[in-house]
Design a protein with these regions (language model features):
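Pyridoxal 5′-phosphate
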Residues: 1-377
Length: 377
């Protein structure tokens, strides 16, 4: 029996109403949210509508519950190593605030601007490793390549072609350097264990593979790093006794909670909690297996129909498939007219298959691309 007919995956697909009307192959840009996520957010706003902030204490308790959930999800040693941020950009900037003075950074030329621009803006020297046929090679990050580098900066999965790195292999060669990871294109699709991979800091959005919607990101910072390089920005909820309102005698929180500063964005945080509960309930290993299966299936079908696939092959696959097509912008518009969502890239279109997708989604794309390729220019 194919995985598409498995009743478990069929039931999970029904959690995503968007799949009724759309062939949704765009989770690398932003995924639709499942019912459990919209219910969590709507429930919060119904409470707010009906009673203002009467549930303030309950909401704060739920925030800490989500912090525990996220910590377990990424393998953090403790919840205090997790902070909530609205997006990856905020998370990376927070990390840069901690490490900008540590020294040069070793990164790669394929990174999304958010990953590198904050370092450059702060005057940090970046050594940019070139890719080799669309792949970031681990030997390029050996200590000998840039002996003065204080930090290794990488994305778990690259946004442009889906190249997925083995974080544990890279962590094993850190050799005293800080290891900073962007996980926006992998969190929710592939396992992450920050301790096993020896990651010092990690940032992720919630609106992509996490299926949590916009505004629900998170950042992990290892306690030792946080204590050695404490953040500078604080607010009224950065202290241990915020309701004393004693501005001259405060005790700062000894955890990453300090960086959240003010009133929490409860809705997005509760959305993230509902998404993590769903993903953890399925099992991230099972999700990864499903994602890779669909990627392999789609790649086979595309290549068989003569569409070149530019994403790296075995050992580097993810949920993204970069397909070479003529006039990518026109192709995206053509597909959207047929209720198929993908993303334009300079070389072609980026297709993202998540666990809620199916073989029929892949077949619909292949058929539509066949129609597009036969259109007169």
């Amino acid at each position: 029996m194919s995985q598409a007919l498995d009743p478990v995956w069929k039931e999970l697909r029904e959690q995503f109403p968007a799949t009724r009307d759309w062939v949704y192959l765009n989770s690398a840009a932003g995924s639709p949210v499942p019912r459990v996520v919209s219910e969590a957010v709507n429930g919060f706003y119904r409470d707010l509508e009906g009673g203002g902030d009467r549930l303030w204490e309950d909401w704060l308790g739920r925030v800490e519950h989500v912090r525990h959930q996220v910590a377990r999800f990424v393998g953090a040693a403790e919840p205090g190593e997790i902070a909530f941020v609205p997006n990856t950009s905020s998370g990376i900037n927070l990390i840069v605030d901690l490490l900008a003075g540590a020294g040069p950074v070793l990164s790669d030329e394929m990174e999304f601007p958010t990953v590198t621009l904050p370092w450059i803006h702060r005057g940090v020297h970046l050594n940019m490793v070139p890719s080799i046929e669309g792949v970031i090679r681990i030997e390029s990050f050996s200590p000998e390549y840039a002996p003065k580098a204080a930090t290794m900066l990488l994305s778990h999965v690259q946004f442009v072609n889906g190249c997925r790195l083995d974080l544990e292999q890279f962590g094993a060669i850190k050799a005293g350097r800080h290891f900073v990871v962007c996980a926006s294109q992998s969190a929710g699709a592939f396992p992450i264990d920050v301790q096993k991979a020896q990651i010092d800091a990690l940032a992720s959005a919630g609106h992509k593979w996490m299926c949590a919607g916009y505004g629900a990101g998170f950042v992990y910072v290892k306690r030792e790093l946080f204590e050695k390089h404490p953040p500078r920005a604080i607010g009224w909820l950065s202290v241990q006794d915020p309701f004393l309102f004693d501005n001259l005698n405060v005790r700062l929180l000894p955890s990453m909670r300090r960086t959240e500063m003010g009133c929490p964005p409860f809705g997005p945080i509760f959305a993230l909690g509902a998404a993590v509960e769903l993903l953890a309930g399925i099992g991230i290993e099972k999700i990864a297996e499903r994602v890779l299966y669909l990627n392999e299936y789609l790649t086979f079908r595309l290549e068989r129909k003569g569409f070149p696939v530019l994403s790296p092959g075995e050992g580097f696959r993810s949920g993204q498939t970069l397909v070479e097509v003529e006039r990518p912008a026109d192709a995206v518009a053509f597909l959207k007219e047929r209720k198929i969502l993908v993303t334009e890239k300079p070389e072609g279109i980026r297709v993202a298959t998540h666990f809620f997708n199916s073989e029929e989604d892949c077949e619909a794309l292949v058929r539509a691309l066949g129609e597009y390729s036969r259109q007169p220019v």
